[in-house]
Amino acid sequence: MSTSDKSINQWAGMNQPAKQSEPLFMIQSPPIYKLPFGDAQIILVSDGTLALGSPEKSFRGISKKEIDAQLSRHFLPTDNIVIEETVLVLMSGGKRILFETGTGVSPLYPHAGHLQTSLAEAGIDPASIDAVVCSHAHPDHIGGLSTANRRPQFPNAQIYISEIDFNFWTDAKLLGSPLDRFAALARENLLPVRDRIVFIKDGHEFLPGVQAMLTPGHTRGHTGFLLTSGNQSLYLIGDLSHHHVLLLERPRISFAYDLDPTKAGDTRAKVLDMLSTDRTAIFGYHFPWPGVGHVARQHGGFRYFPKPTRWIT
């Protein structure tokens, strides 16, 4: 069993603190953010958070001292990495396109799985979603495709994902292997909706204003998406980078849940260089809320510049 394989199963069953009832003053406002986008509109909603624990468990090829220094420079805690799960809804041409589905009802992720609540707060009926687009088949991205009784969560939606990832993660041969947990969850969520799935191809504009860009490494068929509307563009990085500091400043260090760490690092560096050169805005699924900003080259790596949020328009 490789270190990466062990980490995948550990992540799927990580010990996270149980949910606790919170006093009223701890409750935040609904996690919804609306963003104009060319001739369309983007609505960002939260599925919750994932706690990765001590950063040295997830980020490899870098010493704990270096990790602590990087995080401290950005005033971030050094004892526990917590990442966001933010789902993007594109409202364009009378269609509603949902990107990623969060963790769903899995008990493995106690602080995530809030997508349906967030959509309700935003006034979005799951039945009104026309398309669901997934960057890859990990459970924190496809876990919300099905309900607890394995019925389609988005009953009227076509589902888009790469054929490479679908075939790999739903292969029964993975059951009982080091990748068992992720494979089982992929099968539970993808197979019940197989008749609704459309496979996407690298470089194709498979929906109006939505182009697929294969970015392998994290998984074999991991895909990023370039959105365009009017004169605006936004690149959805998926899991190209899970952290807005560590994997940008040092893009070639390895991340424990990358299936092919070397290829993931090469892809990350290449895509970040492209986004920096083109000054293309990005959306990071796991970046700090709401996850929209830019990347620029800095000191041999890259730096993330979040887009200023506007709560009153």
What are the language-model segments listed below?
Residues D47-G48, T101-G104, A137, I164-D165, ...:
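Active-site metal-binding loops of divalent metal-dependent hydrolases
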Residues G230-T313:
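Cap/insert and terminal regions of metallo-dependent hydrolase folds
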Residues V132-I142, T215-H222, F283-P290:
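Histidine-centered catalytic micro-motifs
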Residues I97-F99, V133, I159, L234-L236, ...:
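Residue-level marker for buried hydrophobic side chains located in beta-strands
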Residues G113-I124, S128, P155-L214, K263-K270, ...:
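Metallo-beta-lactamase
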Residues S7, W11, P17-Q20:
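Cationic, low-complexity basic patches in intrinsically disordered or flexible, solvent-exposed regions
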Residues S29-A122, G224-G238:
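Conserved beta-strand hairpin/beta-sheet module of binuclear metal-dependent hydrolase folds
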Residues G93, Y109-Y160:
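Active-site metal-binding motif and surrounding structural segment of the metallo-beta-lactamase
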